[in-house]
C-alpha cells in the first residue's frame, strides 16, 4: 500500500467506490472521520494501492468529477501516485473511462496542469498515451494534450522492445476502423515528421512564409483580388491567406503570425 511514514487509515473499498460513482459527500465525511492514531489521509490507498484520486480520475462521467479531483489535488492528493501495477491517474484517465468524452479531456487537462508526469512508466513500461484502447470523437483532444505536454510517441517495454503509437493504433485499439482514427494518424504523423509538438504547430507559419517568398519572387501567381466572394468558412480562410501572401515587408505578416499561436 502506498502511504506516508505515519500510520494512516487504509482506504476502504466502499469509499473508493463512492468516489467512483460520484458520492463525494460520503468521501468527504469519511476523510473527516479519522482519529489522531489513525488519520485518514487524502492519499490513503486501499485495494491495489488505489487512492481517491485514482478512483475519481478513472471513472470521470460529469463535471462534478473534475471539481472533486480539483478539490483532492488542492488538499494534497499526489497526481503521480502509483497503483500496484504502476498506473498513475493519467494512465487510468486514458484507459479506464471507456470512450473519450469532453469530461475525460477536462480531467486529463486538469491532471497535466497540476503536474502529472506525461511520460511516467507503469510496471511494464507503458506511458499514459499507450493506455488509450478505443477511439471516439474526443480522443484526438487527448492525443493533443499529451504530446503538447511532452509525451513521447514511443515507449520501451520492460522486456526491451519498443513500440510506436502508430503500431499501438494498429494493434491495440478496439475500433481501428473508426472514422476518427484517420485524423489521429495524420496528427501523429505530422508531429513525428516535424520532430516535436512545437515544430508541428509552426508548420503553417512556415508554409505561409514560404508561399509569400515565392509570390515576392514571381515564382507563384495569385488570382486577381475579388471584390465579392461566396460566403463560407473555407472561402474566408482562402481570402485571409491571399491577404497575407500579398503583403510586402511592411511588418503586417509578422504581426499576424505573432498572434497566431496554434495549440501549443
Q: How would you label these PLM feature ranges?
A:
Residues 26, 64-68, 103-107, 141-142, ...:
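Conserved ankyrin/ankyrin-like repeat signature
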Residues 29-40, 69-78, 106-117, 144-152, ...:
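Ankyrin repeat domain, specifically the short helix-to-loop turn at the C-terminus of the second helix
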Residues 166-264:
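Cullin-RING E3 adaptor/co-adaptor recruitment helices
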Residues 12, 24, 50, 66, ...:
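Generic preference for well-ordered alpha-helical elements
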Amino acid at each position: 500500500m502506498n502511504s506516508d511514514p505515519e500510520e494512516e487509515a487504509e482506504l476502504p473499498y466502499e469509499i473508493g467506490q463512492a468516489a467512483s460513482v460520484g458520492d463525494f459527500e460520503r468521501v468527504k465525511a469519511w476523510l473527516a472521520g479519522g482519529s489522531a492514531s489513525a488519520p485518514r489521509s487524502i492519499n490513503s490507498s486501499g485495494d491495489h494501492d488505489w487512492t481517491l484520486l485514482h478512483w475519481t480520475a478513472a471513472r470521470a462521467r460529469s463535471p462534478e468529477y473534475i471539481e472533486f479531483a480539483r478539490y483532492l489535488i488542492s488538499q494534497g492528493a499526489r497526481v503521480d501516485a502509483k497503483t500496484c501495477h504502476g498506473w498513475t491517474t493519467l494512465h487510468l484517465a486514458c484507459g479506464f473511462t471507456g470512450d473519450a468524452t469532453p469530461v475525460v479531456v477536462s480531467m486529463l487537462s486538469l491532471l497535466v496542469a497540476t503536474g502529472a508526469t506525461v511520460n511516467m512508466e507503469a510496471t511494464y513500461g507503458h506511458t499514459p498515451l499507450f493506455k488509450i484502447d478505443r477511439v471516439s470523437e474526443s480522443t484526438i483532444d487527448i492525443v493533443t494534450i499529451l504530446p503538447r505536454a511532452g509525451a513521447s510517441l514511443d515507449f520501451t517495454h520492460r522486456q526491451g522492445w519498443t513500440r510506436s503509437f502508430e503500431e499501438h493504433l494498429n494493434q491495440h485499439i478496439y475500433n481501428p476502423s473508426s472514422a476518427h482514427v484517420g485524423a489521429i494518424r495524420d496528427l501523429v504523423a505530422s508531429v513525428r515528421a516535424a520532430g516535436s509538438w512545437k515544430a508541428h504547430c509552426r508548420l503553417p507559419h512556415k508554409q505561409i512564409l514560404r508561399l509569400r517568398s515565392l509570390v515576392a519572387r514571381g515564382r507563384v501567381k495569385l488570382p486577381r483580388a475579388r471584390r465579392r466572394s461566396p460566403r463560407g468558412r473555407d472561402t474566408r480562410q482562402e481570402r485571409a491567406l491571399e491577404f497575407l501572401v500579398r503583403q510586402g515587408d511592411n511588418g503586417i505578416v509578422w504581426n499576424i503570425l505573432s498572434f497566431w499561436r496554434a495549440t501549443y
